[in-house]
């Protein structure tokens, strides 16, 4: 039985289903195997006793005798997820990897329905890799192995304040380290009661300073600074003993050139002289908060996902054995998931986008903090 999503076998299966490799996808459900059935004495009585999942099995093609066998076999299994994994009815059940998953399988299946191939794959660059010069002469270059994926290009036909949110989850530089992920959300449809959608993502390994400026590059590519907020997850940067030592200086430098940078220091405290603490701090309080909101968001379809790999990370995110902490299953990552959890949470906590009909003067420093949200 195949177990786990996001691994080689799962990726190969997905590519085969999409016709992107030379393999023919064939799935054999448990009810396609004749030995998995038992006789039924009273068919009418059995039909009236069937639950919702058993009716789903019937719709998938299982006979009543097969469903009767499944009902009896399930009594031998400690957890329903083990039954689904050992005797899968669908490919999704076959790839299920854990019974401690944080997000419901039915919800992630729904989230996966809006995933599509990007219209662009490559890289974004400016005159320099860091500093204010990195925001000048921005250009895209197509590359097969590039880190940037775009599902929707910027719409600059008209300005909309608060339209875009760019979220960065900081990773490491080495191949073994976590990835840095930068996700762009477009909130345009929220003006009319709609929902935000993922429109671009940069995913790879990069130095922290270059990665931070890369996030600002993407924000600048999509909108003027008053129209795109940059949110950098700062926990990694503040707790690491190596690569993150100088990141406070880097964020201060960015703030000097880009005004719409998320700050968790209350604005009134800054006015009184308190130092600005840039970035979203993920800790034992805020992580459960944004993860709980993300669970609600995918359950209630509160945002549009485009990236299959991001859904994979939802499928491999679990509650650990202590029953308190959460994270990716061993060998997997959650960087894409965290940009979604933070980004969607912020999408619903700042003011709605609105059209800007007249030219705007040079913006003054605007502090966006947890207090203002």
List where the protein language model places each region.
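RNase H-like, metal-dependent nuclease domains and their acidic two-metal-ion catalytic environment used
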Residues: 1-9, 18-22, 38-40, 44-266, ...
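Active-site-adjacent substrate-recognition loops and nearby beta-strands
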Residues: 12
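Conserved AAA+ ATPase "SRH/arginine-finger" region at the nucleotide-binding site
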Residues: 26-32
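Surface-exposed intrinsically disordered loops and tails
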Residues: 269-276
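Amphipathic alpha-helical blocks and their helix-capping loop/short-beta junctions
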Residues: 277-284
């Amino acid at each position: 039985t195949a177990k786990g999503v996001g691994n080689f076998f799962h990726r190969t299966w997905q590519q085969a289903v999409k016709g992107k490799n030379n393999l023919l996808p064939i799935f054999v459900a448990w009810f396609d195997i004749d030995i998995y059935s038992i006789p039924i004495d009273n068919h009418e009585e059995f039909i009236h006793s069937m639950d919702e999942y058993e009716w789903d099995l019937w719709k998938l093609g299982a006979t009543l005798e097969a469903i009767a066998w499944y009902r009896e076999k399930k009594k031998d299994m400690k957890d329903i997820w083990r039954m689904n994994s050992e005797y899968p009815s669908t490919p999704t059940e076959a790839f299920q990897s854990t019974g401690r998953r944080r997000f419901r399988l039915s919800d992630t299946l729904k989230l996966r329905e809006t995933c599509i191939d990007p219209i662009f794959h490559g890289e974004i660059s400016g005159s320099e890799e860091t500093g204010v010069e990195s925001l000048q002469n921005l250009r895209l270059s197509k590359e097969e192995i590039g880190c940037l994926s775009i599902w929707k290009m910027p719409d600059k036909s008209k300005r909309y304040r608060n339209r875009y949110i760019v979220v960065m989850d900081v990773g490491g530089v080495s191949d073994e380290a976590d990835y840095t992920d930068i996700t762009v959300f477009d909130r345009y449809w929220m003006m009319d009661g709609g929902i935000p959608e993922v429109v671009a993502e940069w995913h790879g390994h990069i130095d922290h300073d270059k990665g931070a400026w890369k996030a600002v590059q993407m924000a600048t590519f999509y909108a003027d600074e008053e129209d795109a907020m940059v949110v950098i997850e700062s926990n990694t940067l503040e707790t690491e003993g190596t690569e993150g030592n100088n990141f406070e200086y880097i964020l201060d430098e960015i703030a000097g050139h880009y005004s719409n940078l998320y700050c968790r220091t209350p604005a009134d405290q800054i006015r009184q002289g308190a130092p600005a603490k840039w970035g979203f701090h993920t800790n034992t309080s805020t992580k459960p908060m944004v993860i709980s909101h993300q669970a609600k968001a995918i359950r209630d379809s509160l945002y549009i996902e485009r990236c299959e790999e991001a859904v994979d990370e939802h499928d491999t995110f679990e509650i650990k054995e202590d029953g308190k902490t959460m994270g990716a299953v061993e060998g997997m990552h959650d960087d894409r998931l965290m940009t979604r959890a933070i980004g969607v949470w912020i999408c619903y906590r700042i003011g709605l986008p609105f059209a800007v009909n007249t030219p705007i003067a040079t913006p003054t420093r605007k502090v966006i903090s947890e207090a203002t949200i």
